[in-house]
């Protein structure tokens, strides 16, 4: 794999280790089983969940320089870190462009990256979505970004389905195989 991907995987595995598996990039099969936001989203059978979880676990992937070794059946899903990885690559490229001194980039609505100072010297102002608002133009507040910064928001309101009055969202708990039950609707990080 490339140096960039190797570095990304190394950081993700460190986060997995530091979080004792609460974040785990090896839940690819689990993500595909639920398919939340996809055409085949469903509440899987308990046996199906147990079956895919046996192939998960950040300890099942090993990096040796730019070579990845995974136990048979293990499957990666980098969705939780994809936009952050993308921002790192964009920043690296922008730093090589002498004619680009400032930029504001929207990376899919839930992530925004600023580069350099805004030409008029003011802050880049980014609205944070109100997860339970009826009108998608409603927001909780505005975050002022200065210089090169990255803001990312995620929550149980982005990709989900409701069945029998229960909200099933895309943020999975690798220890249970079900959507995480933290009581938190959304989180924004700068």
Residues covered by each model-derived region:
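Mature catalytic core of soluble alpha/beta enzymes
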Residues: 1-190
């Amino acid at each position: 794999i490339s140096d960039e991907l190797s570095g990304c995987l190394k950081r993700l595995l460190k986060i997995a280790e530091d979080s004792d598996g609460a974040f785990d990039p090896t839940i690819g099969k689990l993500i595909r089983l639920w398919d939340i936001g996809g055409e085949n989203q469903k509440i899987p059978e308990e046996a199906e969940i147990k079956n895919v979880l046996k192939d998960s676990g950040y300890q099942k992937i090993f990096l040796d320089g730019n070579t990845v070794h995974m136990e048979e059946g293990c499957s990666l899903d980098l969705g939780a870190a994809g936009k952050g990885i993308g921002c790192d690559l964009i920043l690296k490229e922008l730093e090589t462009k002498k004619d680009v001194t400032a930029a504001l980039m929207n990376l899919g609505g839930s992530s925004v990256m600023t580069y350099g100072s805004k030409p008029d010297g003011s802050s880049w102002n980014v609205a944070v979505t109100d997860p339970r608002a009826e009108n998608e133009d409603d927001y909780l507040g505005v975050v002022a970004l200065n210089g090169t910064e990255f803001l990312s928001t995620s929550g149980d309101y982005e990709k989900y389905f409701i069945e029998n009055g229960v909200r099933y969202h895309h943020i999975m708990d690798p220890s249970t195989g079900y959507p995480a039950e933290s009581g938190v609707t959304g989180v924004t990080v700068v």
